[in-house]
């Protein structure tokens, strides 16, 4: 009798466990899925620019942006110029904003780059971002840069940049800097 009671209890326990899994699966299926238009959670802020993002930026645009960093590292200002639009808005890490023609921007950057004997960039990562409602493409980068000046001074910093790309060219560039030392 004890064996039968034990077996019945064990069977009921196993069935009860399986039933909960079924209930959990059906409860999960009844929950509405989050959509791009409706956030899954009640957030304390509403994005003023956009909260609708995808990674729908071409690999060619990504390569072009990363090549501009390689051109800076190698001192290839003419190569860097090819990745920039006719007019570029630049938000510098100093807080200054400049709007310059491609030629004037290259003059500014040539002066800076010519003061250095070497530049080394350790590209930590990047993200392709496409604002689906604004229809704008961005490549965001995170990297460390080590600059050796011709005076012998060595400077290093961590950077976070935002590159807005339109028609295969960078039209807006914002740079944020944190010195390493």
Task: State each model region's role.
Residues 68, 79-81, 88, 105, ...:
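Hydrophobic pocket/interface hotspot
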Residues 96-97, 146-156:
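Short, cysteine-centered beta-strand-loop-beta hairpins and adjacent loop/turn segments enriched
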Residues 77-129:
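A solvent-exposed, acidic/Ser-Thr-rich amphipathic alpha-helical stretch
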